[in-house]
Amino acid sequence: MATEYASSGEYIKHHLQNLTYGQHADGTWGFAHGAEEAKAMGFWAINVDSMLFSIGLGVLFLFLFRLAAKKATVGVPTGLQNFVEWVIEFIDTSVRGSFSHQNALVAPLALTVFMWVFLMNLMDLLPVDWLPYVATMAGIPYLKVVPSTDPNVTFGLSLSIFFLVLYYSVKMKGAGGFFSELAFQPFPKFLFPVNLLLEGVGLIAKPISLALRLFGNMYAGEMIFILIALMFGGGWVLALFGGALQWAWAVFHILIITLQAFIFMTLTIVYLDMAHAEHH
């Protein structure tokens, strides 16, 4: 597929472009025909591919775990049940080790975050040309299949966690306690403007770093796969080397995929634990 483009730059730009729907400059609504047109659509434009893949993978997660729960047996687990039980035990251990309070929401939330992010990251292991080529044959000009390479998705996830942190911070400590936590430490109370600035920046940095860490790592991984795919258009020697390189990077990328999902989940638990901690 790389040979169908006029240049390597055009190939890369195509694979990094989302299928974006929004309002055109003339007031009509439709899909963007390039990066500039997508940018001109503004804030309310929707990356349709990111939405469809992220929602679809979320539904897949619910379906698989629901199926495993319905078919669970008291004997030795096998197949899907074995995998689901292992994941749940892993999440339970992680929550017990990082969350020191009582909240029935945290463990299911941690499970959902881990599996959802993992499945979105896992899409990066699909060959970069497969689904975009099928989409092109169906008349769809652009298709990005890895939702976690879209900052809109990663920021949506991190902001959801951030709002939960704010909610539990106020619920557990009260509005006054939460404010005093921001304004009266680490320096003496008369320096509350400095404290408020420092703690406020630290608070806002949490969702930003959470989103950018996931986005940056997955975007870089996708870019490497795209660059390797370019080698298949450079003759059989480069194609052979590219195939070996792609396999090696895919094996290594499995670690990155899992690690990024684990980090996102762990930081979610830690932030919620901090929100539940009593103010002193």
Curated annotation (Swiss-Prot):
GO biological process, one term: proton motive force-driven plasma membrane ATP synthesis
NCBIfam families linked: ATP_synt_6_or_A, PRK05815.1-1
Keywords: ATP synthesis, Cell inner membrane, Cell membrane, CF(0), Hydrogen ion transport, Ion transport, Membrane, Transmembrane, Transmembrane helix, Transport
Protein name as catalogued: ATP synthase subunit a
Classification via CDD domains: ATP-synt_Fo_a_6 (cd00310)
Species the sequence originates in: Thiobacillus denitrificans (strain ATCC 25259 / T1)
Family: Belongs to the ATPase A chain family.
Gene Ontology MF term list: proton-transporting ATP synthase activity, rotational mechanism
